[in-house]
Amino acid sequence: MKREQKAQIIEELAGKLRENSVVLVDYQGMDVAQSTELRRRSREAGVDFVVAKNTLTLRAAEEAGLPSLTEFLVGPTALAFSRDPVAAAKLMAEYADEIETFRLKGGLLEGSRVLNEQEVEALSKLPGRDQLIAQVVGGMAAPISGLVSVLNNTIQGLVVALGQIAEQKQAQQA
């Protein structure tokens, strides 16, 4: 590989490392069908699955000013990038459960915190970004809808009471 190509790859990887969370995996022993399936699932989940030389990945991390990933860059290593830290962890952990030779190595959370294998596994069990947003919005909407229900029931009760008073007045006049 020429120097220009290496420099371009390092620059691309550094950009991805700065802008995304990343999960590092050992993909040794995967066949072509398994690799193709993983890439398809990655695209569907919005995860960018990249295989790069360890030396280039190490240089990219240094160029991006990130913590050292040296401990994870031993043997065949692939990187799964995602803006949603949980998405990449969840997908890679699911695949590691399905394929014996595929295993999690570690990760980098939002470009600053190095995660070991157990921490990536724990991250994969959390709800995704969209689910968390939905839970927060639902939590905020619940008290409001409860208030609307109480006010609605109060108004209905008032209308019923006024209707009964009107009937009593009409009965007294008759």
From Swiss-Prot:
GO molecular function terms listed in the Swiss-Prot or TrEMBL record: large ribosomal subunit rRNA binding
Keyword terms of this UniProt record: Ribonucleoprotein, Ribosomal protein, RNA-binding, rRNA-binding
GO cellular component, one term: ribonucleoprotein complex
InterPro entries per the UniProt record, alphabetical: Ribosomal_uL10, Ribosomal_uL10-like_sf, Ribosomal_uL10_bac, Ribosomal_uL10_bac_type
Superkingdom of the source species: Bacteria
An example Gene Ontology biological process: translation
A Pfam family annotated for this UniProt entry: Ribosomal_L10
Covalent S-S links between cysteines: none
Functional summary from the UniProt entry: Forms part of the ribosomal stalk, playing a central role in the interaction of the ribosome with GTP-bound translation factors.
Family: Belongs to the universal ribosomal protein uL10 family.
Record note on quaternary structure: Part of the ribosomal stalk of the 50S ribosomal subunit. The N-terminus interacts with L11 and the large rRNA to form the base of the stalk. The C-terminus forms an elongated spine to which L12 dimers bind in a sequential fashion forming a multimeric L10(L12)X complex.
Annotated protein name in UniProt: Large ribosomal subunit protein uL10
Originating species: Rubrobacter xylanophilus (strain DSM 9941 / JCM 11954 / NBRC 16129 / PRD-1)
Gene that produces this protein: rplJ
